[in-house]
Amino acid sequence: MSGAVLLCLFFSINVGNIQWDLRYIPILLAFLYGGKRAGWGVAAIAVVGRIGQGGDLFLLGVVLIVLTALFYALCVNRFYMLPPRWSRIRYASLLVILPATIQTFGTLYLINYENHLSESWVAGWLYIVFLVVTVVLVTYLFETLLEKERIVAELVATEKDFTKGELAASIAHEVRNPLTVVKGFVQLLSEDKQHAEYHKLILSELDRAESIIYEFLNTTRPQTNATFHLNETAREVVALLTPYAQERSIQLTIGTCEQAIVNGNENKVKQALMNFVKNGIEASNEGDTVTIQLDRLKDRAQIEINDNGVGMSRQQLKQLGTAYFTTKESGNGIGTMVSIRIVEMMNGMVTFKSKPGKGTKVVLSLPIEKENE
């Protein structure tokens, strides 16, 4: 994108003092598909290129590039929450129209072409239309390529899940049998009071091993989907975990939105929500509040879980969701991995934001069932 923005600047069409170019397209695409860091990098290169060009209106051009980059940085998060392809294409088109319109007609007003004012305005409108058409075509290409990558990734994941499911079921069966036998004999020996503590420890570890097997199997079992009300599910989770929070002097609050009906496995969604909320409770300090906020963004439902706990470093965030990684004194990290997988199997998405000592935000995004809107 850095090279593209320079090409757009130096291979522009100049009519009098007006420079017609496509500089905003590489900047926009860098923000949308590369993130804020890439977007600001491309914008900085565009500023350097515009200064190098000089001209009577170079200062205005620099200011417009900076303001446009700031505008894109503020709007880019919304783009990530939109479903792929057409919703994103429409949003990208709107993002390019505003700065292009301000630049085009603002420049025309400042220059005030008295002799060819009507022709300049026509040229301005044609320029904006050309920008929008170009953005639509380029964004469509990006979205098509990303969609193909997603399809290939899903096919590979499905094949892996099938193989993993068969292997997991076989391993679980073979491991559970000796565990059951050992557990039975330990329970018989528990009458020996002399070693009662040892018996409790053994039983506890056997229960933990069985729990790990159960959680691992959950990642491979196919889902039975049905429509359900996400607000009600979230309220049930809060009701179930309120006593657990009160034991630790933690307050749970929930804010719901207009009714959001989603299609999926309600029990598994409840399991995922309980895991994330429980993690927030366990990471919080006495007297803290854990908030659960539901919002509806067009055709997606969003659940935010915020805590003011210990937080996580950037390195810990990268490892989050991998098996056997946990920031807690006890636990194995499989619960978080399973919860993320549950949401992803519903075409949803889980994102984490956290800083050490400043708490953690977990955002779940799920598609809303269109037939029931």
From Swiss-Prot:
Superkingdom in the source lineage: Bacteria
This protein's UniProt keywords: ATP-binding, Cell membrane, Kinase, Membrane, Nucleotide-binding, Phosphoprotein, Transferase, Transmembrane, Transmembrane helix, Two-component regulatory system
Membrane-spanning residues: 27-47, 57-77, 91-111, 122-142
PROSITE patterns for this protein: HIS_KIN
Chief localisation class: membrane
Topology in membrane: Multi-pass membrane protein
Recorded GO CC terms: plasma membrane
GO MF: ATP binding; phosphorelay sensor kinase activity
Keyword field contains Transport: no
Catalysis: reaction(s): ATP + protein L-histidine = ADP + protein N-phospho-L-histidine
List of residues that carry Phosphohistidine: H173
Listed InterPro entries: HATPase_C_sf, His_kinase_dom, HisK_dim/P_dom, HisK_dim/P_sf, Sig_transdc_His_kin-like_C
Protein location: Cell membrane
Ranges where the Histidine kinase domain occurs: 170-370
Class of the enzyme per the UniProt entry, highest EC level: transferase
UniProt EC number: 2.7.13.3
Protein function: Involved in a sensory transduction pathway that enhances the production of minor proteases.
Protein name (Swiss-Prot/TrEMBL): Sensor protein DegM
